[in-house]
Design a protein with these regions (language model features):
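A membrane-topology feature that recognizes alpha-helical transmembrane segments
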Residues: 1-155
Length: 155
């Protein structure tokens, strides 16, 4: 019984961290390591408290590797083509932490849903900024944080 309460608190803490990370990313464009690390530690704690009922040790390790690894690969490819930093390493760490919670299949779904949420967010930002005719073609200059979209995908 007591373990269920602590597992629930881990879950509530993770939701709070995802909201906090989203706000920070929207305001300053960073996903601080302390929050990503705390998210991962809460995931480990959750699985320990639930006796690995949701994911095995191997599954959450693979989830972290796949989540962080896939996003790191996307980042490297995008950086190569755009000749500048695209996704930040905070986004990579966020998806690695999500993999601890969600496992391999869940983190792939989170990446997909997060990318879709990010696309919708990006379209909204562009529409909100009301791009004028003279600025057409400059859409690539917008910097849209990926963290909030990924947070939505994770949830």
């Amino acid at each position: 019984m007591i373990f269920d309460i602590f597992a629930f608190l881990c879950l509530i803490g993770a939701i709070g961290i995802l909201i906090t990370l989203s706000v920070i990313d929207l305001k300053i464009g960073l996903l601080p390591n302390i929050y990503n690390g705390a998210l991962a530690l809460l995931g480990i704690g959750f699985h320990l408290l639930t006796s690995f009922a949701w994911l095995s040790l191997l599954d959450f390790a693979l989830g972290a590797l796949i989540g962080g690894g896939m996003l790191y690969a996307v980042r490297m490819i995008a950086n190569h083509f755009y000749k500048q930093d695209t996704l930040g390493l905070g986004d990579v760490k966020l998806l690695a932490a999500a993999g601890v919670w969600l496992g391999p299949q869940g983190v792939l779904m989170a990446i997909t849903l997060g990318a879709l949420a990010g696309l919708i967010h990006g379209i909204g930002v562009i529409a909100y900024k009301n791009i004028k005719k003279d600025s057409v073609g400059k859409v690539s200059h917008f910097s849209i944080p990926a963290g909030p979209g990924f947070a939505v995908g994770i949830l």
